[in-house]
C-alpha cells in the first residue's frame, strides 16, 4: 500500500487491556472505505489467529507407592495433595496464552512435570523453542512431596477474538482534502487484552489483508 499514514489519536491502558484509536489516511485508490473498515474489523475479530491450549491431559502418580504408575485424572478429581480445587487448576490452564517467535506449525505440544512440593508456575512448562508464554502465573500448589503430576498440553492456532486477544474493534469514516490530494480517513478504535498491543494487531491486519486490499 502506498500513501498510507497512521497516527495515534488516543491511547488508554489499564492492568488487563489496551485501547488505541488510530487515524489511517489512505489515497483515493481505496474509494470504498466502508468496505475497508469492514475488512479490518472482520479480520481482527474473526480471522486473526491466537495460540491457545486445545487439549490437556493430567497424569498423577504417588511417589510413595511401590510402582510409580501414572493414571489419568480430570477436572472433577479430588487430589488432597493439591491446595487448590482441581477444577480451578483446570481453568487456569485454559487461560494461558502463547506467542510464536516464528510460524512453524498449527499444532504444538508442551509439558509440565512436577518434582516435590511448592508452588508450580507457568514458567515451569516446557514449550517448543519457537513459542513463549505471554505471562508467568501461578498454576497450583503441591502441599506434599508424595504426588507427582505430569501434564501434556496440545496448543493450537485458532481464529477469533476469544483466542487472539482482540476485544473490540470500531471504525469511523471521514473524507478530507490536503492541497491537491484527496485523503480518505479511517478512524480505527482497537481494544486488546494485556498480552497483545493494538499496534501489533493493526500491523498483523495490514500484513494478512494485503491480498484483499489489492483487489479494491
Swiss-Prot record:
SUPFAM superfamilies: Insert subdomain of RNA polymerase alpha subunit (SSF56553), RBP11-like subunits of RNA polymerase (SSF55257). Its EC number is 2.7.7.6. GO terms for molecular function: DNA-directed RNA polymerase activity; protein dimerization activity. In plastids the minimal PEP RNA polymerase catalytic core is composed of four subunits: alpha, beta, beta', and beta''. When a (nuclear-encoded) sigma factor is associated with the core the holoenzyme is formed, which can initiate transcription. This is DNA-directed RNA polymerase subunit alpha. It is found in: Plastid, Chloroplast. Keywords: Chloroplast, DNA-directed RNA polymerase, Nucleotidyltransferase, Plastid, Transcription, Transferase. It comes from the Eukaryota. Belongs to the RNA polymerase alpha chain family. One of its GO terms (cellular component) is mitochondrion. DNA-dependent RNA polymerase catalyzes the transcription of DNA into RNA using the four ribonucleoside triphosphates as substrates. GO terms for biological process: DNA-templated transcription. It comes from Euglena granulata. It catalyses: RNA(n) + a ribonucleoside 5'-triphosphate = RNA(n+1) + diphosphate. The keyword Transcription applies.
Amino acid at each position: 500500500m502506498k500513501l498510507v499514514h497512521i497516527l495515534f489519536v488516543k491511547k488508554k491502558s489499564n492492568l488487563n487491556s489496551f485501547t488505541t484509536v488510530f487515524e489511517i489516511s489512505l489515497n483515493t485508490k481505496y474509494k470504498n472505505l466502508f468496505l475497508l473498515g469492514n475488512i479490518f474489523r472482520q479480520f481482527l475479530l474473526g480471522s486473526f489467529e491466537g495460540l491457545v491450549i486445545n487439549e490437556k491431559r493430567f497424569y498423577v502418580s504417588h511417589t510413595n507407592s511401590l510402582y510409580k504408575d501414572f493414571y489419568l485424572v480430570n477436572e472433577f478429581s479430588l487430589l488432597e495433595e493439591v491446595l487448590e480445587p482441581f477444577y480451578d487448576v483446570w481453568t487456569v490452564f485454559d487461560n494461558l496464552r502463547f506467542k510464536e517467535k516464528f510460524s512453524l506449525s498449527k499444532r504444538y505440544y508442551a509439558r509440565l512435570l512436577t518434582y516435590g512440593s511448592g508452588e508450580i508456575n507457568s514458567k515451569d512448562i516446557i514449550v517448543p523453542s519457537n513459542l513463549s508464554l505471554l505471562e508467568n502465573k501461578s498454576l497450583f500448589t503441591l502441599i506434599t512431596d508424595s504426588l507427582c503430576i505430569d501434564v501434556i498440553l496440545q496448543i493450537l492456532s485458532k481464529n477469533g477474538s476469544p483466542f487472539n486477544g482482540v476485544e473490540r474493534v470500531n471504525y469511523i469514516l471521514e473524507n478530507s482534502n490536503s492541497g491537491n490530494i484527496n485523503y480518505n480517513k479511517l478512524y480505527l478504535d482497537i481494544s486488546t487484552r494485556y498480552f497483545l498491543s493494538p499496534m501489533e494487531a493493526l500491523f498483523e491486519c495490514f500484513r494478512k489483508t494485503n491480498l484483499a486490499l489489492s483487489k479494491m
